[in-house]
Amino acid sequence: MPKYRSATTTHGRNMAGARALWRATGVKEEDFGKPIIAVVNSFTQFVPGHVHLKDLGQLVAREIEAAGGIAKEFNTIAVDDGIAMGHGGMLYSLPSRELIADSVEYMVNAHCADAMVCISNCDKITPGMLMAAMRLNIPAIFVSGGPMEAGKTKLSDQIIKLDLVDAMMQGADPKVSDAQSEQIERSACPTCGSCSGMFTANSMNCLTEALGLSQPGNGSLLATHADRKQLFLTAGQRIVELTKRYYEQDDASVLPRNIANKAAFENAIALDIAMGGSTNTVLHLLAAAQEGEVEFDMTDIDRMSRQVPHLCKVAPSTQKYHMEDVHRAGGVMGILGELQRAGLLKDQTRTVLGISLQEQLAQYDVKQTQDPAVHTMFRAGPAGIRTTQAFSQDCRWDTLDDDRQEGCIRDKAHAFSQDGGLAVLKGNLAIDGCIVKTAGVDESILKFRGPAVVYESQEDAVNGILGGQVKAGDVVVIRYEGPKGGPGMQEMLYPTTYLKSMGLGKQCALLTDGRFSGGTSGLSIGHASPEAANGGTIGLVRSGDSIAIDIPNRSITLEVSESELAARRAEQDKLGWKPVDRQRTVSLALKAYASMATSADKGAVRDKSKLEG
């Protein structure tokens, strides 16, 4: 039977000093021997998705202590990708994921914590904590801050829903008046919470449900709604139960690697494809799988992408639905229920509720259960009141959206498309693959061929797009923006947004070894692997080269002869695979990250071969 890790610091005469320090933190004599549970918070006033988390850690802590544990809270950093976007700050976003994972490991292992509750929300925080949970493999439950309410405003006598991307697009569109742009800006982000569409933050919080590491409702229940408080209370109670089951009953089934196993990762990517989630989730799932030694890679993602239909269409792929609408339709449990009925779910995986996914769906899928409490929970809706306070309203929809033919969530027979929301493309331009969010691609450009317009940085691409260098039919190529080449693998939301604002959103393609915001839509292909800095073919493209993209057949081809490519490669080998004339300051911290970063097909994690002798 495993020994409590915390006993290392709480038992034995030689630990008198450690116990003295524990006492100074408030631990009482009768507490020694109880499990020490880390409350891993990520409160910050920089990020709307985290601004309301300050007191929620102690909410969890009180429940832990009432259930017989010792709760100790600490915070991680949290970068707001939207605020960091469009300037040098975005270089730090993805590397912050590794720092978060490491900082959780450092705190938990340094103090010998027995288990943890992870309070996350936004883009890199949930993935960083997920990587740490898989790495440490101690009992863990995730509970996120929840989604923001969708913005709403009146334009041309019509109420429309808004989000961050609308503010960015309107601000970049020269045809939009200053007054309208300011109106959209003021209305786009009305409350605390992660941005209101199926962007990276909400996608990842949904995926923790599919992985079995969070409770039903975690991904979709609004940050402002009073019902969300129960998720935090239950997390505090439940983590003590899981901890005692492992350490006192030798039940290893409650550990993250046994909950989030290969089948659970396949369920997570099936959910991601079905809901048209952010392409960043691919990066983060690959990274988490590696931390947990789960054999899950791009081959699995490619296979699943050919099987799973697109069942849920949400902003940025449509402005009709946001996360509050997904919740009203049954949330993640509703989507997983449809995958189950389509035979596309492995429902014998376990969850932090201590039951199988099949049993959990029987209780929480609104199409399977008539439990009034569950139906009431999924009717939790927005209040439309600007606030930074969690649990500040208790509004409810009058009815559920359980229309699986024309509603927000569809059954397989009435899917938005039988082809899923994500696809892996391969070819001589991306030998190890690249990712496109097909949910956001117009049917007219699923097959596309055009001349390349090559840029060595995102900044140059933005200037080129706004300067009129890109024409209808072009393929914009932005390279040396991968994990190593950027470094930091910047998000390319501004280039895609500006293509739309210039009227080219359905007339151009964009290819990069960088990545895209969860707010991106259009023919935007990212994660080209190997990246240019690692000798990838994307580093050999020249302006004017023809590029052929075929999403239905999952291919991407640089239409240049092998002999010409060989000559170009020899030239780049001499030049060292570096961007030409790029003006960018790279700090020592970023250089340290770049020195060990793998390409996107490996999750942009550290190259462990450089650490192992």
Curated annotation (Swiss-Prot):
Gene3D superfamilies noted in UniProt: IlvD/EDD C-terminal domain-like
GO CC, any one term: cytosol
Cofactor(s), names only, from the UniProt record: [2Fe-2S] cluster; Mg(2+)
InterPro entries with a match to the protein in the record: Dihydro-acid_dehy_C (IPR042096), DihydroxyA_deHydtase (IPR004404), DiOHA_6PGluconate_deHydtase_CS (IPR020558), ILV_EDD_C (IPR056740), ILV_EDD_N (IPR000581), IlvD/EDD_N (IPR037237)
Binding residues annotated for [2Fe-2S] cluster, in chain numbering: 122, 195
Catalytic activity: (2R)-2,3-dihydroxy-3-methylbutanoate = 3-methyl-2-oxobutanoate + H2O; (2R,3R)-2,3-dihydroxy-3-methylpentanoate = (S)-3-methyl-2-oxopentanoate + H2O
Keywords: 2Fe-2S, Amino-acid biosynthesis, Branched-chain amino acid biosynthesis, Iron, Iron-sulfur, Lyase, Magnesium, Metal-binding
Cofactor remark from the record: Binds 1 [2Fe-2S] cluster per subunit. This cluster acts as a Lewis acid cofactor.
GO molecular function: 2 iron, 2 sulfur cluster binding; dihydroxy-acid dehydratase activity; hydro-lyase activity; magnesium ion binding
Binding site for Mg(2+): 81, 123-124, 491
Residues modified to N6-carboxylysine: 124
Listed EC numbers: 4.2.1.9
An example Gene Ontology biological process: isoleucine biosynthetic process
Annotated metabolic or biological route of this protein: Amino-acid biosynthesis; L-isoleucine biosynthesis; L-isoleucine from 2-oxobutanoate: step 3/4; Amino-acid biosynthesis; L-valine biosynthesis; L-valine from pyruvate: step 3/4
Pfam families: ILV_EDD_C, ILVD_EDD_N
Active site per the UniProt annotation: 517
HAMAP family according to UniProt: IlvD
Function of the protein: Functions in the biosynthesis of branched-chain amino acids. Catalyzes the dehydration of (2R,3R)-2,3-dihydroxy-3-methylpentanoate (2,3-dihydroxy-3-methylvalerate) into 2-oxo-3-methylpentanoate (2-oxo-3-methylvalerate) and of (2R)-2,3-dihydroxy-3-methylbutanoate (2,3-dihydroxyisovalerate) into 2-oxo-3-methylbutanoate (2-oxoisovalerate), the penultimate precursor to L-isoleucine and L-valine, respectively.
NCBIfam families: ilvD (TIGR00110), PRK12448.1 (NF009103)
Quaternary state and interactors: Homodimer.
Family under the similarity heading: Belongs to the IlvD/Edd family.
Protein name from the UniProt record: Dihydroxy-acid dehydratase
Native species: Vibrio cholerae serotype O1 (strain ATCC 39315 / El Tor Inaba N16961)
Chain's gene name: ilvD
